[in-house]
Amino acid sequence: MYYWNKPMETIGREDLERIQLERLQRTVLRMYTNVPFYRERMQQQGVKPEDVQSLADLRLLPFMDKRDLRDNYPFGTFAAPRQEIVRIHASSGTTGKPIVAGYTANDLQMWAECVARGLGCAGVTKKDTVQVAYGYGLFTGGLGLHYGVERIGATVVPISAGNTKRQLMLM
């Protein structure tokens, strides 16, 4: 069987849950410290970052929905300083204001790694060619898949949508 990142893809349950808890605690502390909206919502629920001691404690965190994201448009939910944001993506906004997501350089590296793992599970290797037909605009799909394919070392055909005849020619 092929693994892109064998240590992470074959990690034991106990180690996986330890990593998940560490990352959850780090994320909760970062959003509590850096994002007034999240801090206020947590305070309304009577939750502090140190209350998250297990994965089951995820249930203590306040539920947030699309409306909350739209109400804090465009940058009210960013946990990183704006000068660390290297890319912005957004939803189409068909139900109101678009939902905006800002990515740091590290976010993009992690995103490419996660996509590479998924592609590796599907059997993609550096010997393959992957045609990316997702859009390359504000939607996150096109670039996310693109950089995951490149991380594996496979060839990317960044065709986006449309141009069916050209797509067939390149395949």
Question: Where are the predicted features?
Answer:
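Short glycine-enriched loops at secondary-structure junctions
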Residues: 108, 135-138, 162
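Conserved AMP-binding loop of ANL adenylate-forming enzymes
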Residues: 120-148, 152-154
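Nucleotide 5′-phosphate-binding alpha/beta core
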Residues: 1-90, 95-113, 117-121, 125-127
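Short acidic, glycine/Ser/Thr-rich loop/turn "cap" segments at secondary-structure junctions
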Residues: 96-103, 127-133, 152, 168-171
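Conserved adenylate-forming
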Residues: 26, 37, 142-171
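Conserved aromatic-histidine-acidic binding/catalytic patches
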Residues: 103, 137, 159
